[in-house]
Amino acid sequence: MKPRHKRALIIIAALIAIGVAALLILNALNSNIALYVTPSEVAAGKAPQGQAFRIGGMVKDGSLKRDGLTVHFVITDLAKDIPVAYIGILPDLFKEGKGAVIQGRMNANGEFIASEVLAKHDENYMPPEAKHALDQAQKNGSAK
C-alpha cells in the first residue's frame, strides 16, 4: 500500500471515530436534558410526554402529607396546581409556601412522580423561570 493510501485510510478512520464520538456525546446530552415547565404549562398539556422534566413553583400551603418515606404535596404557580409524589428524604429547606424545583415524570393519573426535589437555598433566590412564571400567573390572576 502506498503512503498516500495509508494516509487517506488514517484520515477516514479518524473522521469515522470523531463522528461516532460526537454521536455518543449528543445522545448522552439528549437523554440527560430536563426541560423546565410550569404547573400551568403541565395543565395545558405542554409538558414533555414520556420523558423527565422539571417543574417549578411554590409548595402549596397545607398540601404536604408524609407516609413513611413517601411524601405527597402540591406544586403551584398560583394559577394551576399539580400533585406530586416523592419517595425519599426532602431537603432541609423544603417547606410549604416556599419555592421548589422538582424533576421527574407525569404518570397516567396526572400525578407528577418526582425523582429529585430541589428547594431554594436562599430566602431571596428563585430560579428565573419560576419567578417569571409566578409573576405571569399573578398578573393573569389579578386580571380576572
Curated annotation (Swiss-Prot):
Pfam families, alphabetized: CcmE (PF03100)
Membrane topology: Single-pass type II membrane protein
Cytoplasmic face residues: 1-7
Residues noted as binding heme in the record, renumbered to the chain: H121, Y125
Source organism, top-level taxon: Bacteria
Main localization (coarse): membrane
Subcellular location per the Swiss-Prot or TrEMBL entry: Cell inner membrane
UniProt keyword terms in alphabetical order: Cell inner membrane, Cell membrane, Cytochrome c-type biogenesis, Heme, Iron, Membrane, Metal-binding, Signal-anchor, Transmembrane, Transmembrane helix
GO molecular function, one term: heme binding
Function: Heme chaperone required for the biogenesis of c-type cytochromes. Transiently binds heme delivered by CcmC and transfers the heme to apo-cytochromes in a process facilitated by CcmF and CcmH.
Protein name per the record: Cytochrome c-type biogenesis protein CcmE
Organism field: Polynucleobacter necessarius subsp. necessarius (strain STIR1)
Chain's gene name: ccmE
